[in-house]
Amino acid sequence: MAEELLFRKDVKKELTWDLSLIYKDEDALMADAARLESLTAQLEKDYKGRLDSADRINECLDKLREIYGIVTLVGNYCELATSVDYYDTHNMELAGRMNRRISECMSSLSFIDSELSAKSDELINEAAQASKENANYLKEVLREKPHLLSPETEKVLKALSQTTGAPYEIYNTAKLADMKFPDFEVDGKKYPLGYSLFEDDYEYDERTDVRRAAFAAFSAKLHDYENVTAAAYNTAVQYEKTMSDLRGFDNVFDSLLFGQHVDRTLYNRQIDLIMDKLAPHMRKYAKLLGRVHKLDKVTYADLKLPVDPEYSPKLTIEESKDYVTKGLSILGEDYVNMVERAYTERWFDFAQNQGKSTGGFCASPYGKNSFILLSWNGRMSDVFTIAHELGHAGHFKACNAAQSIFDTDVSCLLYTSPSPRD
């Protein structure tokens, strides 16, 4: 039976990730934030209105790379700290302050793209040929030139970046801090409920009455928040539509795909393949689940059931390490060493606690190790999540080590398409 979710302060330290691998303490974070502001002010003073040669352009971008590195560390530290506990008011307030400081710096630096876009293509190409580290940044300037707004407008948009991200923050706050799930009851027995308890435990429970009751109780609570969720989503969609129009795209699809370097025909093909080719197999899969588990009918609450219950043993975290290490050993010694480091250096946040983000993700701040979030339930699905996220870690370990920070912001299509989970 699933256990009541703990508060973050009550979980075991060994189940949490070690953010001191980014900054040893908050003082170190604040020192880097101050350095960020100092470097930003100096760069603006030295280069605003003076990007008139290939050498000057590359000098400016060399210093911008250092600034981007600090932004990545400060931003990741704060985001990771808040992602595990939306009830931690100190970390939430700290993240708000740091995000405001980052927005102010990015607003001050918006002159770079505006001024570069006003230069001739010949000058930008000359600068790109002179610096491997800055080449892709400069090529992106040329690609985005037709969609850039006035310098004043771009500066304002950068300053408002924290505000324009509000819809997702509102959604997460409602989901992780405000929603209080009641216990549900089956045959006179009460069961605790929460986001991760449902998504990572009850959805896989082979007791049909418990699984479906959990689904009903979970869905009922989501229904209570449908209006605020819809309002937040609508705000995000309206913002994307407005920006698409302002930047001269034909529609929102083209605007969003442009940012991901994805051609519209490729996107349409993927959607068509899923609907036309995958759908029949998924219907067969649902019928198979019904036969294996002897269900009267297959509902949405039943789709996460294991096809082979005997293939889903309960596991410890240490046992997961053995599965993952053996499974990924084919990728070589460096990969196995990375897996070992991930476990021993606490790259993972395994804890189940109230206020923690759901699902799983891997963050790989430039120049540091990766950080992987999940809620451990001791199922084989958790092992697959670990292997999946370590795949991202391995990708960005190699990517970050070999390339300029300008070249590590890769398209979602590149890093998700190889994964069957995405």
Where are these regions (language model features)?
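Auxiliary, metal-adjacent structural segments of Zn-dependent hydrolase domains
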Residues: 311-366, 379-380
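A well-structured
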Residues: 1-310, 321
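Catalytic glutamate of the conserved HExxH
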Residues: 385, 389, 393
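Conserved small/polar residues in nucleotide/adenosyl-binding loops
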Residues: 415-422
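Post-HEXXH active-site segment of zinc metalloproteases
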Residues: 396-414
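Short acidic (Asp/Glu) and glycine-rich catalytic loops that position anionic groups and cofactors
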Residues: 10-15, 301-304, 366-370, 396-402
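Short pre-active-site segment immediately N-terminal to the catalytic Zn-binding motif
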Residues: 373-386
